[in-house]
Amino acid sequence: MAATFLVIGLGRFGTNLALRLMDSGNEVMVLDSDEELVNHIAPHVTQAKIGDCMDEEVLRSLDPASFDFCFVCISENFQSSMETTSLLKELGAPMVVAKADRDLHAKLLLKIGADEVVFPERDMAQRTAMRFSVNGALEYVELAPGYAIMELDVPDHWARHTILDLDIRKKWNVNVIGRKEEGAIRPIDASFVFAADTHILVAGRPDDITRMVNKG
């Protein structure tokens, strides 16, 4: 069953988020005060509304309690983001996710009711930095502060060796959790022999993964 989303704010993040959610088969309503932005995205989402997100009656008319997730994507105007987040919770929104640019803003948003805060620019910068600073890195996902999963090509000297031979966990404090083959994630055990073109998924602290690949 498709999830329902309310996306408030049609900047770059809000627009791209709404479109990707639609691509994934969800139902998406968007709200912004800029008529041009709303008209541009309207053909591509379930519903598109023009209105002031800080107007309680406007938000009430959208029935925030009926959405599975409400995204507040207006971090450029922090006062507006705060008020909108607070109003959504007052109107019964079950899950409010707010965009923030600073840690202080995130703390305040959580304090007034946001269920989760995201930092899209910072997260993208971190992913990009990791991809280009780690040899062979293909993808990077931070699961929690200080813990990540990375997809990468195996280092050249791993070829023809097993996880057991290389003693990866003990030496680097990194776990090899799977391998990617023909687009699918497959299990891997300690006796698997790496080939030069093996793609693996590893989990651990980002600095440990970096040391393992670049120095190991």
Where do the PLM segments sit?
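N-terminal Rossmann-fold NAD(P) dinucleotide-binding loop
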Residues: 14-15
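Cytosolic Rossmann-like ligand/nucleotide-binding regulatory domains
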Residues: 8, 31, 158-216
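Residues in the short beta-alpha loop(s) of Rossmann-like NAD(P)-binding domains
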Residues: 11, 34, 102, 206
